[in-house]
A protein has these predicted regions:
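Extreme N-terminal starter segment of soluble prokaryotic enzymes
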Residues: 1-4
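Conserved N-terminal subdomain of the carbohydrate kinase-like
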Residues: 12-23, 38-123, 128-138
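Conserved beta-alpha-beta core of the PfkB/ribokinase-like small-molecule kinase fold
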Residues: 118-190
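Short beta-strand/turn micro-motifs composed of small residues
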Residues: 8, 49-51, 143
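Short catalytic helix/loop segments, enriched in acidic residues and glycine
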Residues: 22-35
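Residues that scaffold the ATP/ADP-binding catalytic core of kinase and kinase-like folds
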Residues: 15, 183, 203
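Conserved small/polar residues in nucleotide/adenosyl-binding loops
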Residues: 192-199
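Short polar catalytic/cofactor-binding loops
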Residues: 8-13, 199
Length: 204
């Protein structure tokens, strides 16, 4: 059994700046796996991802670093377009393609002590997937994807519609200050505020 399993889409990112346009792989699961690859022991880690065959080179690069990868076929790869102005803090983001969401059936043969869900968009992981994985091990979730919804090609900030129920099954929740404010409705937030949502989260 693996100690840690990260589940999430590897993306194709189009980065547009006033000086150049570049294409590169990305996504929480991609960078998480590259971070793990710098540790001495990678044999107890596994990545589960879903992407189209056109982006399989990103998987090959990760495997070349000694990481075990399970690829779930998808009709498309998540394709982000990030446009930056002269001020790099100003970014316009669009989603030009979405991958298929993960399902319980696809994850039945995946075993680990800790699962980390690298969500990128609000429909990557259903509540059923969250419930299922919470019964198999410690569940950690990156909240950012649940707070982003795609309409057309534009990305809109949204609240996590099923957060009250989902947070009951999550042991570790990764959020930044803005995400915590969206989840709790408080600018000056604390662990106590999140507990008000009846979570089982031990770490935030």
């Amino acid at each position: 059994m693996n100690d840690i399993c990260c589940i999430g889409h590897i993306t194709l990112d189009k980065i547009v700046t006033p000086k150049q346009t570049a294409y590169m792989p990305g996504g929480t699961s991609y960078y998480f796996s590259h971070g793990i690859s710098h540790l001495k022991d990678t044999k107890h880690y596994k990545l589960v991802t879903a992407l189209a065959p056109t982006e399989f080179k990103a998987v090959e690069d990760i495997r070349a670093k000694g990481i075990e990868v399970k690829v779930i076929p998808s009709r498309h790869t998540v394709y982000f377009e990030n446009i930056y102005g002269e001020n790099q803090d100003n970014r316009t983001q669009r989603v030009l393609a979405k991958a298929d969401p993960f399902t319980v059936e696809q994850l039945k043969d995946v075993e680990a002590n800790i699962f980390h869900l690298g969500s990128l968009l609000s429909d990557d992981f259903s509540l059923d997937v969250v419930k299922y994985l919470s019964g198999k091990g410690t569940l950690a979730v990156d909240a950012q994807g649940y707070l982003r919804e795609v309409r057309g090609k534009k990305v809109y900030p949204v609240d996590w519609t099923e957060k009250t129920e989902a947070l009951k099954y999550i042991d570790i929740l990764k959020v930044n200050e803005h995400e915590m404010e969206v989840l709790t409705g408080h600018k000056a937030v604390s662990y106590t505020h999140l507990r008000a949502h009846e979570t089982r989260s031990k770490l935030v």
